């Protein structure tokens, strides 16, 4: 998925608004994903999946950090997330569809907290970005 210059600007703009809330939004994204797509819980059998659990917050922080890393290296997402791609493909063996679920839930969280920022154009750019992140994380499955 190729991000245009406008897409990159839109994505960076959204993440600048997210600012210090990235970890909170990461946890909220996971909670939403576990409720909307309960099959995703199978990868977290050892987690307390209750609202506000320390484990969800900690993993949400990791998710947020990976997304921020991807934004910071938006011209080389594959390089920025290479180790994470290896982990998910070779060790964790996460079903690739789960990255789509995560991306969708992240878009919902952004829409809830920043409805004015999520214009149709920004929505499309953020969706393309999340698809690009998902593609990178599943690229080494082959």
Swiss-Prot record:
Alphabetical list of Pfam families matching this protein: Globin
BP-aspect Gene Ontology terms: hydrogen peroxide catabolic process
PROSITE patterns in alphabetical order: GLOBIN (PS01033)
SUPFAM superfamilies for this protein: Globin-like
Classification via InterPro entries: Globin, Globin-like_sf, Globin/Proto, Hemoglobin_a-typ, Hemoglobin_oxygen_transport, Hemoglobin_pi
Tissue specificity statement from the Swiss-Prot or TrEMBL entry: Red blood cells.
Domain Globin: 2-142
The entry's keywords: Heme, Iron, Metal-binding, Oxygen transport, Transport
Keyword Iron: yes
Residues of the signal peptide: none
Binding-site positions, O2: 59
Residues that bind heme b: 88
One example GO MF annotation: peroxidase activity
One cellular-component annotation, GO: hemoglobin complex
Record note on quaternary structure: Heterotetramer of two alpha chains and two beta chains.
Known function: Involved in oxygen transport from the lung to the various peripheral tissues.
Record-stated family: Belongs to the globin family.
Descriptive protein name: Hemoglobin subunit alpha-A
Species this chain originates from: Cairina moschata (Muscovy duck)
């Amino acid at each position: 998925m190729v991000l245009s210059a406008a897409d990159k600007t839109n994505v960076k703009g959204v993440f600048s608004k997210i600012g210090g809330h990235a970890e909170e939004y990461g946890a909220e994204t996971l909670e939403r994903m576990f409720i909307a797509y309960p099959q995703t819980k199978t990868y977290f059998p050892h987690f307390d999946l209750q609202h506000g659990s320390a484990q969800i917050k900690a993993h949400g922080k990791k998710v947020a950090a990976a997304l921020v890393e991807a934004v910071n290296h938006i011209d080389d997402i594959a390089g920025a997330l290479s180790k994470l791609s290896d982990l998910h493909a070779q060790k964790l063996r996460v079903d690739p569809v789960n990255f789509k679920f995560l991306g969708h839930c992240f878009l919902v969280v952004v829409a809830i907290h920043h409805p004015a920022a999520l214009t149709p154009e920004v929505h499309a750019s953020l969706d393309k970005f999340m698809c690009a992140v998902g593609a990178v994380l599943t690229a080494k499955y082959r």
